[in-house]
Amino acid sequence: MHKTITVFGSSQPVETDEQYKLAYQLGSLLAKNGFNVCTGGFFGIMEAISKGAVENGREAIGVTVDHWGGAANKFVTKEIKCNTLFERINKLIETGDGYVILQGGTGTLLELAAVWELSNKRLMDNKPIACHSSMWKEITSLMNEQMKLEGRDDGMVKSFNTVGEIISYLVTNTQ
């Protein structure tokens, strides 16, 4: 059984954007390392991840929400439809054996916070959580400082500068 990595990120990037290209590279490398991928199923980073995975022989699960309407991106090989945003977030988290958080906005922030809190409160199995982008590095650094002050585990969420570092971390920590 292949492990699945859930990737969170913006719906805004298009194929010519650096964020899209980085997400495509990540999806490709995840697939080449035997991982299926799971995303929110729509466009932008979600499409790029799915495209990279499918073009390299792996499954791309898309967890969509009826509220926004519209079809999943054409690279999704299995769609899971949810009725609400919170149902969708729960399904994205349940499906993942590890998580990657790429550039995004408030929705991506909500997803990161949900994964982090479930891990922090030991409400889910210990799974790797990897962030990419200077924005997340700043946020996770601030939160880790607070975690230290509270005497909590401050190493749950890791920040990385390259896709290669993320892949190495996931391969090592999803065994």
Where are these regions (language model features)?
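Glycine-rich, charge-decorated loop segments at or immediately adjacent to ligand/cofactor-binding or catalytic sites
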Residues: 44-48, 136-147
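Glycine-rich beta-alpha loop segments
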Residues: 1-61
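Acidic/glycine-enriched connector segments
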Residues: 44-102, 107
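A charged, well-structured terminal subsegment
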Residues: 98, 151-175
